[in-house]
Amino acid sequence: MKTTLSCLAILFIAFTFQSFKGEKKDFHQSVLWQQGTGKYNNYRIPSITVTQKGTLLAFCEGREAGDAGDIDLLLKRSEDNGKTWSNEQIVWDDAQNTCGNPCPVVDEETGRIWLFLTWNKGDDHETEIIHKTSSFPRLPFLCYSDDDGKTWSEPVNMNETCRDNSWGWYATGPGIGIQIKNGPYKGRLVIPANHSYDDPDGNVRKGPYGYGAHVLFSDDHGKTWQKSEPIKPGCNESQVTELSDGTLVMNIRSYNDKHARAISFSKDGGKTWSEIEHDVQLVESVCQGSVLNFGTFNGKPMHLFLNPAVTVARTHMTVKTSFDDCKSWTNAKLIYAGPSAYSCLAKLQDGRVGMFFEAGKKKPYEKMIFVAIEPGELFTPGTVLEKL
């Protein structure tokens, strides 16, 4: 049976390649932010979503250097499928404190764009937050836009319902959330997140702590939110996608020494989750990755997965495709062979694949790059970006 399925998958890819090899390539690339330019010294943590009107919203963190200190949440908009971009917009600047980890979701029923993010005191560092010796905890916040991302509400502290007070570290995404399209939980908004927890057998930052993932979800268009049960052990930054039958899959950065993505399933809209397993088809070097339900392509439901597809370092940004609800990943398209790290995927209004990721010539964090390609290009030979 597995052999038959594999043969069918190969035939489908061959057919797809034949269908598109003569098609004119509609490709463009934009550097949205670059290290050492503008108001900030560094830019990291990409997130991109498509509004109900088809506008692209690209978020990132503007920062001095590392993950602590004065970090602002930034945004650029595109109303022409990524060909041109607006000037930089500051969504949240809280003096010298840290405002980051963007994770937006678009409510397709109301048009409202919800944006989860996390905040902590700028002089607190991750180790202190995990060990609970920081001056203040790291907290989830939420804001929204009703005008296609042009303006945003004041961020609201969501600690009471979205965070367990026994947790140390906390982070939303980074990446995007989803709205469930099928089954009894249709319309539910789901945001992936992660945290650290007390674990006597753990060794996170040389302390008795572990990493866990979870989701936040809302059944009333974002008025109220709940948190799911945790997914653990060794689970950190994550993204969620929906399968054809409404099952949710969490695709997770793993600290379990497997060099592969951790996977967990939910049959109840994200409230509870299965024990983790590791998908050896999706190799990783303990780095964030992104997954997207692209919808139907050539009559088949297609999922995409994007990450640095290596077991060490952060290089070889690669997108893989699945036509069987993430059971198998039958194609790998190299986007950029050089240093590269965090990423986010989007389906553009014109049907192309949008990829927003960190990359550079010497280090992965030199540029924040947006690339848009026709989906058929995923099945052609060659590298999308030979150079930056």
Question: What do the predicted segments below correspond to?
Answer:
Residues 1-26:
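Bacterial Sec-dependent N-terminal signal peptides
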Residues 22-388:
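Asp-box/BNR beta-propeller blade signature and adjacent active/binding-site loops
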